[in-house]
Every structure is written in C-alpha cells, then in structure tokens.
C-alpha cells in the first residue's frame, strides 16, 4: 500500500471521542473535499473522496453529530478517471448542514477559509482540521530527497488557515501555488513525522520513519563506499608516482647510492602497490614504515640534488600524466 493510502486508512479508523474535534474534522473534510451547489433552489453539500472507508466515516459523523442522512455515490473508474471515487452528498438538509459546519456564515455566504469555530478552537480541533484536510486531498511521498506531506486546497484562504493550524501544532508548513493550484507543503522529515502523529497516524509514522532511516543508512553507506574508492585510487596513484620517482632516482645516482637507501628504493620499485608498512615487513631486517619512508625521502632528495647539479631531469620528471591515468 502506498504511503498516502496507508495514512488515510489509519486516519479513517481512528476513534475520536471529542465532539468538538469530530465537528472540526467534518468541517475541514467538507471544505477541502467538497463544495456547495444550488440544485432546484436548494443548497446541496457534496464531498468527493478517494477511499470508501473515508466516505463511510464522513457519512456516519454527519449523522452522529448533526442527525442528517448522507448518501454515498460510487463513481467507477472510467475514461479520464483512473480510480474509483466516492461522493458523499447531503441534499435535503444541505443548507442546515452547511450553516452548522460553518461552510456558510451567518448571512448565508460561503466561508472561503476554515470555519471560525475551527480556526479559534482547541489544539485538538487543529489536529482534527489537518486530519480532515488530509483525508480530503492529502498526499505523503516516500522518504527521500524530495519527500513531502502535501494537501491540495480549494483556495488561498483555506491554505493559509491550514498553515495557521500547523503552526499551532508546532509544525512549519508553507502555502504554495503550483500550476494554478493552492497547496500546503511540509518538507522537513521531523516535521512530517510530528504531523503524522498529531493527526493520529502513529503506525504509519513508524513505517515512514523506518523507511527514512533505511534510506539514510544506504545513502551514508554509498557515500562511505565512494569515499573509500576515492581514497584507494589516491593511494594507488601515490604509490605508482613514488615508484616511478624512486626508479628515476636509482638511475640518476647509479653506483653512488648508499646500500641502505638502494635497498629501500628497490623494495618500492618491486612492490609498487604495497603500503609503507608492508614494505617495512618485506625489508631484511624488517623496518618500521617511518624508517622506510625516511630512507626513500633521502634517496629522492640526493637524486634531485645531483640532477640539479648536472642539469638533467629530476625524479619528478618520471611522473607523467599517462602514468597516473594508468594507475
């Protein structure tokens, strides 16, 4: 099941005991999923949702809280409609429901944001407002670089009201207009997790957090692997360059090179990929890596001084781009 469907399924099964919170959820769900229509001179309230369990929850809450019967119509997938949709409709008592839920103000005008009783309600009402909005038009993407919890809104006023509700819950949300559509977006991973819990989707939050953690572990492992590969490549290039310089040093010095420096140099040339520690173990008698490094450093220094005196290419001349490319 996709993350969005998981959240909506869990929220639809959530038991809410507070009447005020249940009213706030219904008002928000109707505002974000529905609309007011005039049919034969009467106000009809409709809400279109994408899961049957949401439609059944809304129908039950409308009856339990307000005593009005709602009818659920199923719109089967066909043509441009990819998925089955569910329309919850209250026709006979539409105007009364619209007034009681705050969709219409005292003068009978449509409310553009969220009803005043929801905006000025308790923290539990703010949680319920988000729950209703998410059930109506929410989405949650998989954890990742572009993960987001998002709600499509019927207008900028509703979007700003939802941002305000999030602020009351300690969550930073932003209102955006995307391709002519008003949306409220939460992108921070911690904020997404907190909001899921606030809405009542704790189980889905745990699943989302687990996937997020797994992704972060994989990303860290990949970074470390790339880092290790880069280090290995650098080490290999450095070893090849050192061997080439030592080879040139032995050519420059010829028979004048001291035996102990020549022995260290030959080890470097014969074991080009070995570390200094490994070269020390191969020496006879064995040496520390610092001793090996010191002898090779003195060998190169002697050779470069002689090359400068004689005006011939020094040890650095042996390190060519082609040599490093092949490393």
UniProtKB/Swiss-Prot annotation:
Pfam family name, one: LAGLIDADG_WhiA
Task: Kindly indicate which segments of the sequence are annotated as binding DNA.
Answer: 275-308
- Keyword Ligase applies: no
Disordered as annotated region, ranges: 304-327
**A Gene Ontology molecular function term of the record:** DNA binding
Q: Which InterPro entries match?
A: Homing_endonucl, Sporu_reg_WhiA_N_dom, Sporulation_regulator_WhiA, Sporulation_regulator_WhiA_C, WhiA_LAGLIDADG_dom
Superkingdom of origin: Bacteria
Keywords from the named record: Cell cycle, Cell division, DNA-binding
In the record, biological process GO terms are: cell division; regulation of sporulation
> Is Zinc there in the keyword field?
no
NCBIfam families referenced in this protein's UniProt entry, alphabetically: DNA_bind_WhiA
Family designation: Belongs to the WhiA family.
> PANTHER family attached here?
CELL DIVISION PROTEIN WHIA-RELATED
Function of the molecule: Involved in cell division and chromosome segregation.
Q: What is this protein called?
A: Probable cell division protein WhiA
Q: Which organism is it from?
A: Mycolicibacterium smegmatis (strain ATCC 700084 / mc(2)155)
Q: Which gene encodes it?
A: whiA
């Amino acid at each position: 099941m996709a993350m969005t469907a998981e959240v909506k399924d869990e929220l639809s099964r959530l038991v809410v005991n507070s009447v005020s919170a249940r009213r706030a959820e219904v008002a928000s769900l109707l505002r974000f999923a529905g609309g007011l229509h005039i049919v034969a001179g009467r106000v009809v309230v409709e809400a279109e949702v994408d899961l049957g369990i949401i439609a059944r929850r809304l129908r039950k809450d409308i009856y339990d809280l307000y005593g009005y019967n709602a009818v659920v119509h199923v719109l089967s997938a066909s043509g441009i409609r990819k998925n089955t949709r569910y329309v919850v409709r209250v026709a006979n008592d539409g105007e009364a429901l619209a007034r009681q839920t705050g969709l219409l103000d005292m003068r009978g005008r449509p409310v553009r944001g969220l009803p005043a009783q929801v905006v000025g309600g308790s923290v539990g009402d703010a949680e319920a407002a988000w729950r209703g909005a998410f059930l109506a038009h929410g989405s949650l993407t998989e954890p990742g670089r572009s993960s987001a919890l998002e709600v499509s809104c019927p207008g900028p006023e509703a979007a700003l009201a939802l941002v305000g509700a999030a602020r009351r819950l300690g969550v930073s949300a932003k209102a955006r207009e995307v391709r002519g559509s008003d949306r409220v977006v939460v992108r921070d991973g911690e904020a997404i997790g907190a909001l899921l819990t606030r809405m009542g989707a704790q189980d889905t939050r745990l699943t989302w957090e687990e996937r997020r953690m797994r992704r972060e572990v994989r990303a860290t492992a990949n970074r470390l692997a790339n880092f290790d590969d880069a280090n290995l490549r650098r080490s290999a290039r450095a070893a090849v360059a050192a061997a080439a310089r030592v080879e040139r040093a032995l050519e420059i010095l010829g028979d004048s090179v001291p035996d102990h420096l020549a022995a260290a140099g030959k080890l470097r040339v014969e074991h080009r990929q070995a570390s200094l520690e490994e070269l020390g173990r191969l020496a006879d008698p064995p040496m520390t890596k610092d001793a090996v490094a010191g002898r090779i450093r003195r060998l190169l220094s002697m050779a470069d001084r002689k090359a400068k005196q004689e005006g011939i290419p020094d040890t650095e001349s042996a390190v060519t781009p082609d040599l490093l490319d092949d490393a």
